[in-house]
Amino acid sequence: MSTLDGTTALVTGASSGIGEATALSLAASGAAVAVVARRKDRLDALAERIEAQGGRALVIEADVTDEAAARACVEQTVQELGRLDVLVNNAGVMLLGPMEHAPVEEWQRMVELNVLGLMYCTHAALPHLLRAAEDSDRRCADIVNISSVAGRVARAGSGVYNATKFGVGAFSDSLRQEVTQRHVRVSLVEPGAVSTELAGHNRPEVLEMIAKRFEGMERLASEDIADAITYVVTRPRHVAVNEVLIRPTEQQQ
């Protein structure tokens, strides 16, 4: 396994859950990490933890659904940390419920963050990642897009969320085909049920539905997903892990 010494990673949605755990894991592997989210107080606390463990962190408060803000995140990372080798597109939102009475603004939020925000960050980062693949000691770079089992299996009540995650999968594989021969690896990580804040943005009746669906199940921890991401980006140059599907042992779908 290669280390990430001398590299820089940018992690979106880093204020909690998978993003927070991933930033800590990448920093522990040697990367300088730019942590991006809207909740600056949480990012500041995360940066303190990274630096207390001997790492380097850059806090960027931003909403990546704004294309200009997403681009500015990337440019600030390169300006202050010197380069960009790894992009982890983790920011996302899951808003579930039957189609019949669904608030349309929830669809807009999911499309804007889960799809467009991810694309904005990728578009801004790509020139820097291509450069890193040419001039870094690793001679490769990585884009890791966090999807979901919902990008493979559709369920009643989650149609728009499914659509965004199926879309992330299609975008990721198309991009992979474009850049793989230039040694930018594109990986899709698809978690099942994870104990994070993700479901907490839903309406009370939806939260009850989710609780019943996973009642008694030992869910994944954010660190389980962070371990998988770190594994992906620390493979030797000739190894590209294009997909990781990771569920709790007891989860059927």
Which residues are covered by each model-predicted region?
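Residue(s) in the substrate-gating loop at a strand-loop-helix junction
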Residues: 148
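Active-site helix of classical SDR
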Residues: 122, 164
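Conserved glycine-rich cofactor-binding loop
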Residues: 15-16
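C-terminal helical subdomain
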Residues: 188-189, 196, 208-253
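Substrate-binding pocket helix/loop in short-chain dehydrogenase/reductase
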Residues: 98-99, 103-108
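Conserved glycine-rich Rossmann-like NAD(P)H-binding loop of the short-chain dehydrogenase/reductase
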Residues: 31-46
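The beta1-alpha1 cofactor-binding region of Rossmann-like NAD(H)/NADP(H)-dependent oxidoreductases
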Residues: 40-41, 61-73, 104
